[in-house]
Regions:
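Short, extreme N-terminal leader segments that mark the start of a protein/domain
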Residues: 1-29
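A general structural signal for short secondary-structure boundary/capping elements
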Residues: 54-58, 78-79, 129
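Short, structured protein-protein interaction patches enriched in aromatics and acidic/basic residues
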Residues: 32-47, 72-90
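Generic structural signal for hydrophobic core residues of well-folded globular domains
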Residues: 21, 64, 85-88
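Short, surface-exposed loop and linker segments with low hydrophobicity and enrichment for Pro/Ser/Thr
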Residues: 1-4, 66-79
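Glycine-rich, aromatic-bearing surface loops/beta-hairpins
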Residues: 76, 85-173
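N-terminal interaction modules that seed assembly of large macromolecular complexes
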Residues: 24-68
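Residue-level signal for threonine
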Residues: 13, 36-37, 162
Length: 173
């Protein structure tokens, strides 16, 4: 019988995808991810499971902006990446004090076999993502114009890639 898993959305960068392809494993940055937790379900009084999961996914997409703001992504500094994983439930630890969807992954290392999907900003989204990366800190501090710019980036479509496409995505994009 297969172990019970939970879908976790991990914020990433394109460089992290390259590392996953080349090394066959990757650590979630600081062990953090986002998932449908009891706190997130409680937060939503309406909505189905898919809508609630999308909220966790969006949290990961916003966190990808923060990773890009660090400035160490060289290949695609203006493309968000979210990695969807299926992780054994015993490795997923909700952290409601950090946010309704926040989970700590222990261990934080995952392999390509755990991939459920890869999501990457499309080229047309790069300008909005660039602006959001520049303004993410101001948005966190309540600047309304910055919040709108971040919201515009989050509204942009992220392309879906099947886990089997990881090598091609890294080599051909």
């Amino acid at each position: 019988m297969a172990a019970k898993t939970e879908r976790v959305y991990v914020p990433a960068t394109f460089g992290m995808l390259t590392e996953l392809k080349e090394n066959g494993k990757l650590a979630a940055r600081s062990g953090w991810g986002f998932a449908v937790t009891p706190a997130l379900q409680e937060f939503y009084t309406e909505g189905d499971e898919e809508e609630i999961a999308y909220s966790a996914y969006q949290e990961a997409a916003m966190s990808s902006l923060r990773l890009l703001a660090i400035g160490d992504e060289t290949d695609f500094p203006h493309r968000r990446v979210v990695i969807s994983l299926d992780v054994p439930v015993e490795c997923v630890h909700p952290q409601p004090d950090m946010g309704e969807a926040v989970v700590k992954l222990v261990p934080a290392i995952f392999t390509p076999e755990q991939l459920a999907a890869i999501h990457v900003d499309i080229e047309e989204s790069e300008e909005a993502t660039k602006k959001a990366v520049e303004l993410i800190d101001a948005a966190d501090l309540g600047d309304e114009d910055a919040e709108l710019a971040v919201g515009d980036a989050l509204d942009n479509f992220m392309a879906f890639y099947d886990p089997s496409e990881l090598p091609f995505l890294v080599d051909l994009l």
